[in-house]
Design a protein with these regions (language model features):
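Short glycine-rich substrate-engagement loop in P-loop NTPases that contacts/grips substrate
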Residues: 69-99
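Flexible beta-alpha connector loops of hexameric P-loop NTPases
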Residues: 77-87, 111-123, 170
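Conserved nucleotide-binding/hydrolysis micro-motifs of P-loop NTPases
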Residues: 79-81, 110-112, 147-152, 174-180
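Conserved catalytic/switch belt of AAA+ P-loop NTPases
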Residues: 110-149, 157-161
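A short helix-turn-beta junction within AAA+ P-loop NTPase domains corresponding to the substrate/partner-engaging
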Residues: 139, 155-174
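Conserved AAA+ ATPase "sensor/coupling" helix adjacent to the nucleotide-binding pocket
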Residues: 158-160, 181-188
């Protein structure tokens, strides 16, 4: 399977690698009849490899044919939140529709909301996303990336059903000095 070697080449992360392979095997075991959500969360500190892991997961799922169009898009707050009230739902829906058959990766997903929940733009965006996650579960994958505490406070807390839309959750531990030296040696 393409991109499995990229996953395997990641320094350390042995448990994460096994869990991702388990996720792949889960979908391969009953590809035609699965009714489960593919949506995934990747938690980790800055520089821990969250974005790289999200790309690998998306590429694997695309190459296994789980997503009909096979495209991968990256988004951030400004791609989903509009300038004027009432426009955010339209902007978010347009982005999500363009991702059908593919994977949407939202980096720093906690920036879509805030901890005091007084941002109606955020609510609009997250409500549209939440509905889309369920209605398009068979041919759409969403991967969100961010810091665990911020995602809980500023993203998942905005909608009680949102957390269960992401059944696959991976936490990347920070690299230690030994791993950083390995990475440095690979680069130079």
């Amino acid at each position: 399977v393409p991109y499995i070697s990229d996953l395997n080449d990641m320094i350390r992360m042995e448990t994460l690698k096994k869990d991702i392979v388990y996720q792949i095997l889960y979908y391969l075991s009953d590809n035609d009849n699965y009714d489960d959500l593919m949506h995934t969360v990747i938690y980790g500190k800055p520089g821990s490899g969250k974005t790289e892991i999200s790309k690998i997961i998306a590429d694997i799922n695309v190459n296994l044919g789980f997503l009909s169009k096979g495209h991968i898009k990256f988004a951030k707050r400004s791609d989903m939140i509009a300038e004027y009230l009432g426009q955010t739902a339209i902007k978010t829906q347009k982005l999500l529709n363009s991702c059908k058959g593919g994977c949407l990766i939202i980096d720093e997903a906690y920036s879509l909301g805030n901890s005091d929940k007084r941002d109606s733009y955020s609510k609009e965006c997250i409500d549209v996303l939440n509905q889309f996650l369920t209605e398009n579960k068979k041919d759409f994958m969403c991967i969100i990336i961010g810091y665990e505490e911020e995602l809980q406070k500023c993203f998942f807390s905005h909608n009680p059903g949102l957390d269960r839309r992401f059944p696959w959750k991976y936490k990347i531990e920070p690299y230690g000095p030994k791993e950083l030296l390995q990475i440095f040696n690979l680069l130079f």
